[in-house]
Every structure is written in C-alpha cells, then in structure tokens.
C-alpha cells in the first residue's frame, strides 16, 4: 500500500481526552478515530492489526477442535429472564444496551452469548454421542459502560472471540478447559505479548472456576498478586493469602473504656496504644437483591485487614435464595442518607460491636429484620481483643468469643489479599504485585445455564441430564491495544512483528530523486510479491517527517533508499532496537524474510 493513497493522518500532539500511552499513540498514529464516548472507528492500519490478531485466534481455536459460527447480536429478553440475568445486566451492572421493538418486545444488544448458545444447544443436542461440542465466534459486542475510557480498553463496543463448550460431565469440561488454557497461552505468545495466567473471580458469568490472561503493563486496570516461584498468581479480587500474625493483646481483663473521638482504626490504636491486629473491626454493608429486598450485613474482620467486596458479594449471592432472590442489585457501605431508610434509631457508627442489636433495623416488609453477620477467618482466633461497645465514644478491651460475644455462625474469607502477605501454598513465598490488562478469560460454567434454560442430553443409560458447559473469551480489540501499552517508546508504537499492520515500510527520503524512487518502487513490488507485507512512503514530504511517521506507526522494519544506494545498498532500521544496517539491495528480500521468520518463530 502506498501512503500517498492511504487514509493516513498523524497528529503531533497527544489528544486531550486520551489518558494512557496506548490510547494516545493509536489516536496520534491514525489507527483509530473517536466517533463518540467509547465508540471508535478502526482505520485501515488498525483493521490490519485486528485481522492478524483474529487470524491467530482462529488458528488456535480451530487447532483445538472448536467450530466457528456467528450468533445474533440482538437477543430476546426472554432468554435472559430464563437464566435470571436480565435484571442483573440491565439494572444491577447495567452493562447491557436494551431496547423495545415496534411489537413492544424487549431485546438486548449482546455483551455475551451464554443464553443464545444454550438455547441452540437445547434445541439441537439430544444425545451423548454429539458431545463434546465446542462453538466459537468473532463478533462485535456491546457494553453500556458507565465510564468508557482508555480507548479500546473499555469501550462501549468491541471485538471479541467468545466460545462455548458442551460436555457430558466435569471431567470432559476440564479437558477442554485445559485445552483452552493452552490455546490462549499460544495466542498471546504468538502475538508477542508478555502475559500471566491468573486465578480469577467468575463474576456475573458464574461457574466453579476461571482463569484470566493478563497482559502485563503499568497502565493495567487490574492488580495481580503472584509468587516468584511461579506456582501462584491471582487477580486481587480472587487472591488468597496468609496475613501477618496478630500481635498478642496487652489487655487481659474485659473492660469498657471511654474512647472519645476514635471512630477509625487509626485513632483507636493511637488512643489505646494498641496494634490494629488486636482489634475486631465491624464493617456495615447494605445489599439490595433483585426482588427489592434489602439486607443489612455486618462484616467482622481483623482491624488491620480490608474487606474484599467481590468476595463479600459472592458470599451474599449464595444467600440470595434465603430471601427469595437470585442476584444482588447493589452492595454499598450505607451513607447517612441511606441509613435513614432502614434504621429504627441512630447507629453508634465507629463504635459498633459484633453483637449490635437487630432492633436497630426498622420494621419494613422490604427490609430483612436481622443483620447477616459474617466473621472473617482473621478475626476468629483473636483473644482479648478490642472492639466497639455499641455506644458512641466507647470501646471494650480484653474481649473474647464465647464469653462477651457469640462467634457468628458464618465464617468466611472476605479479606483482601495484598502484597507482602505469605502464600498459602508455601509460607516462605511472599506475594508480589503487578498491573495487568485482562485480555482473555476462561470459565468452567458447569450446569448453571443448562439447568436454567432446560438444555439436556440423554446419556448412555437413557437418562436425561443437564449439559455441562464452559465458556472462553478473548478481547481481540483490547488485545491489540494492550500490545501497544506493553511496547512503545517516546517516538511511538513498537508492534510485535506477528501483529504489525505491515512488516516493512520503504521510505523515499527525496521523492524528486529518480534513482531513490526507482529502487524504492522495485523493492516495494518485490517485497510484497515475496510475502513481506510492505508500505511505500511515496509522499511529497520532508525526510524527517517520513522518519517520524514511520517511528510513530511502529512498522518493524524501515528501508531507506538514501545515500547508501550509491554503493548498491539500502539502510534498514529495526524499530524495536533502532539498530541500523546497510544491506545490499539484492539481499533485502532474503534478509527481511529471515528476520521476520525468526521474530515470529521466537514467540511460538
């Protein structure tokens, strides 16, 4: 392709609304154009990158035995209501675009396709002989993001590969899950990315287990905790660890003490000259289920620890059937305004004890009359601890479970693991932190969707059983931008060779020099004919402008038909290393073929 004929406009300055380097560079280099909030056009260079990423994804999925299909973007609300996710996705998380057609039927623009694929399986799979079955698609998805940001990282529409597998049992599912683990690792390796698979929370998708594939980058939205021995890595939402041991309490007798102005852990530790590890902290939450029922939750945790709200939400979701509900709409620490909607009398905030009376909750049929009390494992073994006295300005010291306070029945792990904690698999290993961009996620769904939608098969004994499912997603457009986030410098993008829009760019320093033009034209034609995808910068611009643009767009190899042609050579500059070599013109094709092959094979 000739740059003189391409829709190609670069910017010298960073766009004002771009926050992270990859977003700035893709806009500046003319790869994408913002059309609206979270909505981008993929321009010719970007489309080539996306096609290359998609091809790698296709090859790995096909090699794993999956079959490509294409599912509808418009999805009837009835399917989502069958699975119980319509309210979750249109009210709670609020990420599904929904609309009403001329027949007054509700529809959703698909952010994901579990319901659709399960409905197809329900209609078409009858026997164990048809299993296992694995289908996938590459398609534009939609999410009504509250705050679209970071370009293609968190847009309102994006390209995604989503796959779904069906099985007779968990063993079959686990095999495909492992196949996908390997396939996803292959995809990212082939794309030239540094990545880390991590244990993850399944979120609204559900299921028994999941793994995220994180591209490591400082601008990543996710925190990953890992150990140096390579045996543990997890998203911070899912991570587990061993906290530091609690310090022994200096309070050996139970006593109520006046502690004015000590509503926070920091203030009470200073006032009592105690360690936060000696304190039982009581954190109040308010959760609203999808049937409108409000439940007040008291999380009892060691004073130096923080509540992991993802873990807490998972525990509360397990309790949803107790309140006639399926999912959580909202989980918050209630504001003073929210408290007024359910309190019968003023709460002693900052001084709450584990046994705060249920009488604080006003009588209301939409409000559960009792606190749900979770005690985190970090608080269970504390002795002679400090905690609130249920009276403003007072704490108690020297308290014990089973004496002054009953130990709540529900013992959970809802603490937030953090760097510096000891690893559970080996207490000599210390958790470290890195930032990552989630570009892939694989799930073991089990029978969540098949049971909800009645998708069954007949086994060898003639019994009807629910299909066991897995699902597997790769953000194609996000992966492409994450490659930029991981590899750039002050001058522009440094594309991995495998997904670069072109392998090489031939730059003519002086468009008025007939010899430069002639050699450039010949190399451009012969390189493309030999399989080296090549751009020709034949614009009537100064050489400095052309060199800057070549660096900005990040093409791996720049061929310059400058002074060296008088010696029968051209200059080739490698974008990643900036190393420059003069190569005989007749050897350019074989040299580049070898370099490109070596660069791609190194990642395979």
Swiss-Prot record:
Keyword Transmembrane: no
Main location (coarse class): cytoplasm
UniProt-listed Gene3D superfamilies: Anticodon-binding domain, Bira Bifunctional Protein, Domain 2, YbaK/aminoacyl-tRNA synthetase-associated domain
Keyword Cytoplasm: yes
Keywords of the record: Aminoacyl-tRNA synthetase, ATP-binding, Cytoplasm, Ligase, Nucleotide-binding, Protein biosynthesis
A single BP term in Gene Ontology: prolyl-tRNA aminoacylation
Record localization: Cytoplasm
Pfam family, one: HGTP_anticodon
Coiled coil: none
CC annotations in GO: cytosol
A GO MF label: proline-tRNA ligase activity
Protein EC: 6.1.1.15
CDD domains: ProRS-INS (cd04334), ProRS_anticodon_short (cd00861), ProRS_core_prok (cd00779)
Catalyzed reaction equations: tRNA(Pro) + L-proline + ATP = L-prolyl-tRNA(Pro) + AMP + diphosphate
Domain of life of the source: Bacteria
Job of this protein: Catalyzes the attachment of proline to tRNA(Pro) in a two-step reaction: proline is first activated by ATP to form Pro-AMP and then transferred to the acceptor end of tRNA(Pro). As ProRS can inadvertently accommodate and process non-cognate amino acids such as alanine and cysteine, to avoid such errors it has two additional distinct editing activities against alanine. One activity is designated as 'pretransfer' editing and involves the tRNA(Pro)-independent hydrolysis of activated Ala-AMP.
Domain notes: Consists of three domains: the N-terminal catalytic domain, the editing domain and the C-terminal anticodon-binding domain.
Record-given protein name: Proline--tRNA ligase
Species of provenance: Trichormus variabilis (strain ATCC 29413 / PCC 7937) (Anabaena variabilis)
Gene: proS
């Amino acid at each position: 392709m000739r740059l003189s004929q391409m829709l190609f406009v670069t910017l010298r300055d960073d766009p004002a609304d771009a926050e992270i380097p990859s977003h700035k560079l893709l806009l500046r280099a003319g790869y994408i154009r913002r059309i609206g909030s979270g909505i981008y056009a993929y321009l010719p260079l970007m489309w080539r990158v996306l096609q290359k990423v998609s091809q790698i994804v296709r090859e790995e999925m096909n090699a794993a035995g999956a079959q490509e299909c294409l599912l509808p973007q418009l999805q009837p609300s009835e399917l989502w209501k069958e699975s119980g996710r319509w309210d979750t996705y249109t009210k709670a998380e609020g990420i599904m675009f929904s609309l009403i057609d001329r027949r007054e039927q509700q529809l959703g623009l698909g952010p994901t396709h579990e319901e659709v694929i399960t409905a197809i399986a329900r209609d078409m799979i009858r026997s164990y002989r048809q299993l296992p079955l694995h289908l996938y698609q590459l398609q534009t998805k939609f999410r009504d993001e509250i705050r679209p940001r970071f370009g293609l990282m968190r847009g309102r529409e994006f390209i995604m590969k989503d796959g779904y597998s069906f099985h007779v049992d968990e063993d079959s599912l686990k095999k495909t899950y492992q196949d996908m683990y390997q396939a996803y690792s292959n995809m990212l390796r082939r794309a030239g990315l540094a990545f880390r698979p991590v244990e993850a929370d399944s979120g609204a998708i559900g299921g028994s287990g999941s793994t995220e594939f994180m591209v490591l980058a400082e601008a990543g939205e996710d925190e990953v905790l890992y150990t140096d021995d390579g045996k543990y890595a997890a998203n911070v939402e899912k991570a587990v660890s061993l906290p530091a041991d609690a310090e022994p309490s200096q309070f050996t007798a139970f006593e109520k003490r006046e502690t004015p102005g000590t509503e926070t852990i920091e203030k009470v530790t200073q006032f009592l000259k105690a360690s936060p590890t000696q304190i039982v902290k009581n954190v109040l939450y308010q959760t609203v289920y999808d049937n409108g029922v409000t439940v007040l939750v008291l999380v009892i945790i060691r004073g130096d620890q923080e509540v992991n709200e993802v873990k807490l939400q998972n525990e509360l979701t397990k309790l949803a059937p107790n309140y006639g509900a399926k999912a959580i709409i909202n989980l918050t620490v209630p504001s003073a305004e929210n408290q007024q909607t359910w309190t019968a009398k003023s709460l002693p905030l900052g001084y709450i004890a584990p046994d705060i009376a249920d009488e604080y909750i006003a009588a209301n049929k939409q409000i559960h009359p009792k606190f749900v009390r979770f005690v985190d494992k970090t608080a269970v073994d504390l002795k002679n601890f400090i905690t609130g006295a249920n009276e403003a300005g007072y704490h108690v010291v020297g308290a014990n479970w089973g004496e002054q306070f009953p130990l709540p029945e529900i013992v959970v792990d809802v603490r937030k693991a953090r760097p510096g904690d000891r690893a559970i698999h080996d207490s000599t290993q210390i958790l470290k932190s890195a930032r990552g961009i989630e570009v892939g996620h694989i799930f073991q769904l089990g029978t969540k969707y098949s049971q909800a939608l009645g998708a069954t098969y007949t086994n060898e004994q003639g019994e009807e059983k629910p299909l066991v499912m897995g699902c597997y997603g790769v953000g194609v457009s996000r992966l492409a931008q994450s490659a930029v986030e991981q590899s750039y410098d002050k001058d522009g993008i440094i594309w991995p060779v495998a997904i670069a829009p072109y392998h090489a760019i031939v730059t003519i320093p002086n468009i008025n020099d007939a010899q430069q033009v002639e050699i450039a034209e010949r190399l451009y034609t012969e390189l493309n004919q030999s399989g080296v995808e090549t751009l020709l910068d034949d614009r009537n611009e100064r050489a400095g402008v052309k060199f800057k643009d070549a660096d900005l767009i990040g093409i791996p190899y720049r061929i310059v038909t400058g002074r060296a042609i008088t010696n029968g050579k051209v200059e080739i500059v490698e974008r990643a290393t900036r190393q420059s070599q003069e190569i005989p013109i007749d050897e350019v094709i074989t040299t580049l073929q070898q370099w490109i092959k070596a660069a791609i094979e190194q990642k395979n």
